[in-house]
């Protein structure tokens, strides 16, 4: 409560003896002798009580309680490579007491994911850019490079085609109809992993 006095005709009245009323203004609804705590616009009125037969008077002051501002939540790293293990992106500025989160807070497989962060109390809190809009944080898991061993020691006969040369499981010739010639020649092949969702297909391998 403010300190001071109201002077009337050279007399004084202690602030502690005054009646105090807080009222909301504009769109703020409030009417109490107790000071408000929520964001809004108010007036506080000090009034000499009717029981005081020596003095009369009132004094009003307008004031505003602004919304507390919070840093927006961000994701420290938003792109991960598939590992086979569960991935949980690390956030920055998240406050469990003041914010809610929902969505894809963890994932294992390759894909695009999103987390939504919202303010629990939008009447009293806002982001530092003065907005209260829910935040959508996007993150992703990308394909990993599969382990594979390039086959060696393959032989065939002149006039045959590449398709006649058998490759290990997962490998295919890029141009299987190619006619073979004499000599040591490298040909392009592709390795396709069993899990094509989480692992890259490797093209243009020299064999």
Which positions does each model-derived feature cover?
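Solvent-exposed beta-strand/loop surfaces, strongest in extracytoplasmic domains of secreted
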Residues: 1-207
């Amino acid at each position: 409560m403010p300190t001071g006095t109201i002077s009337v005709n050279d007399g004084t009245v202690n602030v502690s003896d005054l009646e105090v009323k807080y009222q909301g203004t504009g769109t703020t609804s409030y009417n109490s002798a107790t000071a408000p705590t929520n964001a809004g616009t108010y007036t506080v009125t000090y009034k000499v009580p009717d029981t005081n037969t020596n003095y009369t008077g009132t004094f009003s002051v307008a004031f505003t309680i602004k919304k507390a501002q919070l840093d927006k939540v961000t994701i420290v790293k938003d792109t991960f490579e598939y590992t086979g293990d569960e991935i949980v992106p690390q956030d920055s500025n998240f406050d469990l007491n003041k914010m809610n989160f929902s969505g894809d807070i963890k994932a294992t497989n390759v894909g695009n994911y999103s987390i939504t962060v919202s303010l629990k109390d939008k009447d009293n809190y806002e982001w530092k850019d003065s907005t209260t809009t829910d935040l959508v944080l996007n993150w992703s898991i990308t394909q990993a490079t599969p382990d594979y061993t390039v086959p060696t020691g393959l032989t065939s006969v002149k006039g045959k085609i590449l398709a006649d040369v058998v490759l290990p499981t997962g490998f295919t010739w890029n141009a299987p109809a190619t006619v073979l010639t004499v000599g040591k020649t490298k040909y392009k092949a592709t390795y396709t992993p069993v899990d094509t969702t989480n692992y890259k297909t490797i093209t243009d391998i020299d064999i």
